[in-house]
């Protein structure tokens, strides 16, 4: 059973589409919806590391050993700052980390709310991509959220590997876990000269069955 929070539903669904299964979790109040959901999904391999600084370095070693992307997830506010050293090292070592930071409603920023700092773009030049997801209220928000997650995941190995940051605001973190199926999501594939034969074969099949074909050549 999954969280009712749609942004986290989309994240989990797209992680599965991209085949990203290793998650290093530092559980806190605002990332419980993600933590509980992936722990109950047998697709994911979860590692519990309470201290965020230690979790970041554990994920670095895991990514380096497995040669795969690794997710790190924490609660909001200063907990996110503890990832900084590992994020910087991942950037300069070219290691693909997905940094998931839970956040509060942006309307509450600067209003003396507890556990809230400005987390948007907080890792600055030390990530390849940083996105701030919308709080989903309608179909347009769902589309935008899905697009941003895809953009972040595509950058993990675009022109070299490295970390990406996905910030996840929410109005309430008191999520129930009654959702049986994840939403259908669209994985966006980047095709270039280094793509494997399977991806090229899929696109060749699509072209052969299309009524109108336009091929545009240029530099990526």
What are these regions (language model features)?
Residues 1-220:
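N-terminal alpha/beta PP-like core and its mobile active-site loop of ThDP/TPP-dependent enzymes
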